[in-house]
Design a protein with these regions (language model features):
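C-terminal capping alpha-helices of c-type cytochrome domains
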Residues: 57, 75-94
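Sec-dependent signal peptide recognition
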Residues: 1-8
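Electrostatic cytochrome c docking/interface patches
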Residues: 10-26, 39-44, 55, 60, ...
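Short acidic-aromatic loop segments in the C-terminal HATPase_c
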Residues: 30-33, 59, 91
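Short, conserved glycine- and acidic-residue-centered signature motifs
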Residues: 22-25, 47-50, 79
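Gly/Gly-Pro-rich "capping" loops immediately C-terminal to redox-active cysteine motifs
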Residues: 36-66, 72, 76
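The canonical Cys-X-X-Cys-His
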Residues: 28-36, 86
Length: 94
């Protein structure tokens, strides 16, 4: 129960920490990926990564070129414009 509580608190705090300037959809990423590149998460943090890299990886998941546990399904839910906006926002999170 303690792990579950800690995990839920982390997700809620991560989403809240993104602030109002985050584009729609960015909060869904923070459940697994941290916006802060100095936070350790089981999957790579997105904060500070080049936008082109993030967008490219999302496109690879979306097309099926890159396999993932759930990223292929998540990527399909975003348009190219949404993906670019999310990627640009995460690049600025340093």
């Amino acid at each position: 129960m303690t792990r579950l509580t800690a995990a839920l608190a982390f997700v809620m705090l991560s989403a809240a920490a993104q602030g109002a300037d985050a584009p729609p959809g960015a909060a869904s990423c923070s459940g697994c990926h941290a916006a802060n590149p100095r936070v350790e998460t089981p999957v790579p943090p997105l904060g500070g990564r080049p936008a082109a890299e993030i967008a490219s990886q999302m496109a690879a998941f979306k097309s099926g070129e890159r396999k993932g546990t759930i990223m292929d399904r998540i990527a399909k839910g975003f348009s190219e414009e949404e993906t670019r906006a999310i990627a640009a926002w995460y690049e600025q999170q340093k």
